[in-house]
């Protein structure tokens, strides 16, 4: 009996290894079948650089004192299918996880805002003149739907809409070294040392926009891309009153892709 058990234990690793090899072969076969039907699978990662900005810049924002991009990254998988005999045109569908963030410091005048006074005296609301610090850090699941065009075997351009769901997000900051007028620019003036705001819970969950870019196939299994994504709806709902102008996420992405 002991010999039988010992034999089974010795055979178990071989069975697991064989099963693993079969799974790898099945995965390879599935990828090959997809490629034969015109679909080419890719995995990629990259870095986002940009910001969340009103367009055009409103008169209330007098000067951008500083801008600090966040450590923003993206990971994605996509499938690409080319059409026609010459394989010039194609369709690319993907799913990516991405972060978009920044920090800014600005000088503003008559900037409508609502914040909590750091001295404990309560909420201040009205037209703010002074300094404003803002921190934005949002994470999204994004589906791009892109048309592609190949100039040759190495160069490709792509463009189309994208649709995003915000997994979690932060929009917070502080107003300092200034004063606020009650409700409007001609209201009662109150000096404020520092006040904080946090509108993270008011961020819009669903966003959409356009993406356009180019890609260079450096090696058989490696390509490098540069893309621009431009949000077409603001990060806050249209009825949000604490920020009176729309803020759009505008980011450039440097990406690297492994082509199966």
Predicted regions and their residues:
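A hydrophobic membrane-anchoring alpha-helix module
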Residues: 215-217, 221-233
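Bacterial Sec-dependent N-terminal signal peptides
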Residues: 1-24, 39, 44, 147-149, ...
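Outer-membrane beta-barrel "beta-signal"
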Residues: 216-220, 247-260
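Short glycine/proline- and aromatic-enriched beta-strand/turn motifs that initiate or cap beta-hairpins
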Residues: 19-87, 231, 259
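Hydrophobic, lipid-facing positions within transmembrane beta-strands of outer-membrane proteins
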Residues: 39-41, 71-77, 139-145, 208-212, ...
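Extracellular/periplasm-exposed beta-strand and loop segments of Gram-negative cell-envelope proteins
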Residues: 51-70, 100-139, 166-207, 211, ...
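Transmembrane beta-barrel strands of outer-membrane/channel proteins
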Residues: 43-49, 93-99, 159-165, 226-230, ...
